[in-house]
Curated annotation (Swiss-Prot):
Extracellular side: 1-25, 76-99, 155-196, 259-271
Subcellular location(s) of the protein: Cell membrane
Function recorded in the entry: Potential odorant receptor.
Pfam (any one): 7tm_4
Name listed for the protein in its UniProt record: Olfactory receptor 5P52
Known glycosylation sites: N5
Chief location category: membrane
Membrane side Cytoplasmic: residue ranges: 47-54, 121-133, 218-237, 293-310
One GO biological process term: G protein-coupled receptor signaling pathway
Domain of life: Eukaryota
């Protein structure tokens, strides 16, 4: 009934990270640099994997798709955030806001599935090395990739459908730096008792399923490693899993807070900081996490540099 006493609006004002003009300039320079590093790092990973025959394995196939997902995921947020910092806020239509949220959620969810697929790949490689070529055949790899993207887009469409079913009557100022679901609910004049729960169930299901796959995979990996008699074998097995575990911990830790925990457990400013970390910072860190301690990537990079300058 309350919605009937207001005029429905079709535009939303995204306030951004700060309203301080001086801080806007500082943040613009910082996050433009972060975005450029993200693009260069992830494009370099994709290119290196494509041109290096020794990296044509399932693990690096998944890593190249993770890099692609990180590029789109970061771009869907960074471009809008940079425009806000330049213009001290940004006006978007509800449809544009919903489309941006769809991209962010879709590729963020796809990252969850890819991280689970990479954990399964490590499980097969360490626990069943003789069956690796069979269990991780091209058909299986592309099936896992298909599930990752389809599952991601289904979750994205769930969020989008919920947003498009909302009415916005004003005030339409969103205290965030991109169109995220929780801030949109706060400015809606619709009944959000059901709509607010559906995306949490959808995202929560993806997190629970993928975390279960990752946890079970690493439990079996740990058991197998502890049974190894060779110290060198243990070290090699651990080193192949360290980077992935680091990426998993960083990513799942932040998205769990945003999409699963009750919204009353953190403030709007804390929401901004956590969202900034998983949408902007983690996509920049992933290429470093997966390459700095990876001997195969270092060797492939060295050979690529030699080919270029020889």
């Amino acid at each position: 009934m309350e919605a009937e006493n207001h005029t429905t609006v079709a535009e939303l004002i995204i306030l951004g990270l700060t309203e301080d003009p001086k801080l806007c300039i500082v943040f613009f320079v910082i996050f433009l640099g972060v975005y450029i590093i993200t693009l260069v790092g992830n494009i370099s990973i994709i290119t290196l994997i494509r041109i290096s025959s020794q990296l044509h394995t399932p693990m690096y196939l998944f890593l190249s798709h993770l890099a692609f997902v990180d590029i789109v995921f970061s771009t869907s947020v960074s471009v809008i955030m940079l425009m806000e910092l330049l213009g001290h806020g940004l006006v978007l239509s509800v449809a544009t806001c919903a489309a941006q949220l769809c991209m962010t959620v879709s590729f963020g969810s796809a990252e969850c599935f890819l991280l689970a697929a990479m954990a399964y790949d490590r499980y097969v490689a360490i626990c069943s090395p003789l069956l690796y070529s069979t269990l991780m055949s091209s058909r299986v790899c592309f099936l896992l990739l298909g599930i990752s993207y389809v599952g991601g887009f289904v979750n994205g469409w769930t969020f989008t459908g919920c947003v498009l079913s909302l009415s916005f009557c004003g005030p339409t100022q969103i205290n965030h730096f991109f169109c995220d679901f929780s801030p949109l609910l706060k400015v809606s004049c619709s009944d959000v008792s059901i709509i607010g729960i559906i995306p949490s169930i959808s995202s929560g299901s993806i997190i629970v399923v993928t975390v279960f796959v990752i946890a079970v995979s690493y439990i079996y990996i740990l058991i197998t490693i502890l049974k190894m008699r060779s110290t060198e074998g243990r070290h090699k097995a651990f080193s192949t899993c360290t980077s992935h575990l680091t990426a998993v911990t960083l990513f799942y830790g932040t998205i769990t807070v945003i999409y699963v925990m009750p919204k009353s457990s953190y403030s709007t400013e804390q929401n901004k900081v956590i969202s900034l970390f998983y949408t902007v910072v983690i996509p920049m860190l992933n290429p470093l996490i997966y390459s700095l301690r990876n001997r195969d990537v270092k060797d492939a990079l060295r050979k690529a540099i030699v080919r270029v300058y020889s």
